[in-house]
Structures are given as structure tokens and as C-alpha cells.
Swiss-Prot record:
Top class in the EC scheme: isomerase
Lineage: Bacteria, Bacillati, Bacillota, Bacilli, Bacillales
Cleavable signal peptide: none
UniProt xrefs under NCBIfam families: PRK01222.1-3
Record Gene3D superfamilies: Aldolase class I (3.20.20.70)
Pathway annotation from the record: Amino-acid biosynthesis; L-tryptophan biosynthesis; L-tryptophan from chorismate: step 3/5
Protein's name in the database: N-(5'-phosphoribosyl)anthranilate isomerase
PANTHER family in the cross-refs: N-(5'-PHOSPHORIBOSYL)ANTHRANILATE ISOMERASE (PTHR42894:SF1)
Domain of life per record: Bacteria
Gene name tied to this protein: trpF
Species whose genome carries this gene: Bacillus anthracis
Any GO MF annotation of the entry: phosphoribosylanthranilate isomerase activity
Record keywords: Amino-acid biosynthesis, Aromatic amino acid biosynthesis, Isomerase, Tryptophan biosynthesis
Any GO BP annotation: L-tryptophan biosynthetic process
Reaction catalysis annotation: N-(5-phospho-beta-D-ribosyl)anthranilate = 1-(2-carboxyphenylamino)-1-deoxy-D-ribulose 5-phosphate
Length: 204
């Protein structure tokens, strides 16, 4: 099971997450309490292992700005949380992830229309897109087609207490956590470690 730790804002957390086995780190460039500047993201990314995916999170940002930040920071993928369509995705010409809030099984069908490398299924948006700590009914994704499952990233309120059930139900390619590994709004490296251990054990 692949694991993504999202909302990285400091070097120490990023390095520790990689040491514990994170496969991807997320850097939020949209409005969020976890927003990071491109300058700091670049400093952190330069120190990370080459095999770890560096994913930039954007919401309804222009193609030009996304391309500039991606190039300057050394991002490997972009994660799109707004109303982006396939025309914009093709113009980006960057490996991409489309985030969709799940409210019904029909969201699986909608997901198959996006020309992205991965689909991130999340709880429906609130004030901020993602990172709100809320789960959604995972059984809505229990019967997805194999070709979609192989590119599915599961997010939305995951933590050490529910990750095993979430993986058993959805069987995604990757799981994504942010608030579920925080204490009082800050990333907690011990929670990150335990989350990664539990997620990886589920796929053995």
C-alpha cells in the first residue's frame, strides 16, 4: 500500500515521513491552514529522496501558475481540487491527480471521464478543499472497476484507528492523510509513523 502524507510545511516532518516509508508528500499551494510558499517547498523538496513523489495541491489555479510552481519547486505531480476539466489537464502536460468529493456511487462513473494519472476520492468539500478530517461512506467505492481501483487514492478523515477498515473496503492504490496525523493542528511525527506502519501492514 502506497502512503501520501499531505500538508507538509517543514523540513523535519518531511524528512521523518520519508524515513518512515512515505511514498509521496503533498504541498498545499491553495488557501489552507497548511498552505506553503513555493520558496519553502523548493527548499524541502531539494532535500528529499528521488523516489518519493512530490505533489503540489492546487484549487482553480491558472495553468501558467501551476506550471511555473511545478518547475521551480521540482514537483513530480499536481493534485487538482477545483473545477478543472480535461482541457486544462491536457494543457498542463504534468502528471496529475484529480480530486473528487464522494456523495454517491455515480461519482465513480464521473471519475472515469478524467484524463489524469490518478483519481483522489475525498469527503465532500467544506470551507477548504480537503484536509477537513471528515470521512465518507467507503462502501460507495467498494465495487469500482479494476482499472479505476488501480489509480485510486483514498483520502478523507483517515487516521490510525480507521485506516485498516478503509483499505479493506476500498482496496485503493494509495491512501492520503493530513489532519489524521496531526496534534493540535500540527503534524505529529509519531502519528505519521504509526499511520504508515498500519497502512503498509494492510497490504501484506
Amino acid at each position: 500500500m502506497k502512503v501520501k502524507i499531505c500538508g507538509i510545511t517543514d523540513m523535519e516532518t518531511a524528512k521523518r515521513a520519508c524515513e518512515y516509508g512515505a511514498d509521496a508528500l503533498g504541498f498545499v499551494f491553495a488557501e489552507s491552514k497548511r498552505k506553503i510558499t513555493p520558496g519553502l517547498a523548493k527548499e524541502i523538496i531539494q532535500e528529499l529522496p528521488a523516489n518519493v513523489l512530490k505533489i503540489g495541491v492546487f484549487v482553480n489555479e491558472s495553468v501558467e501558475v501551476i506550471q511555473k510552481i511545478t518547475g521551480n519547486c521540482g514537483l513530480t505531480h499536481v493534485q487538482l481540487h477545483g473545477g478543472e476539466d480535461n482541457h486544462q489537464i491536457r494543457r498542463l502536460n504534468i502528471p496529475s491527480i484529480k480530486s473528487l468529493g464522494v456523495t454517491s456511487e455515480s461519482d465513480m462513473k464521473n471519475a472515469q471521464g478524467y484524463e489524469t494519472d490518478y483519481i483522489l476520492f475525498d469527503s465532500p468539500k467544506e470551507k477548504f478543499h480537503g484536509g477537513n478530517g471528515k470521512t465518507f461512506p467507503w462502501e460507495l467505492l467498494a465495487h469500482m472497476p479494476k482499472e479505476l481501483r488501480e489509480k485510486t487514492i483514498l483520502a478523507g478523515g483517515l487516521n490510525t484507528l480507521n485506516i485498516e477498515e478503509a483499505i479493506r473496503t476500498v482496496r485503493p492504490y494509495m491512501v492520503d492523510v493530513s489532519s489524521g496525523v496531526e496534534t493540535e493542528g500540527k503534524k505529529d511525527v509519531e502519528k505519521i509513523k504509526q499511520f504508515i506502519i498500519k497502512a503498509k501492514e494492510c497490504s501484506k
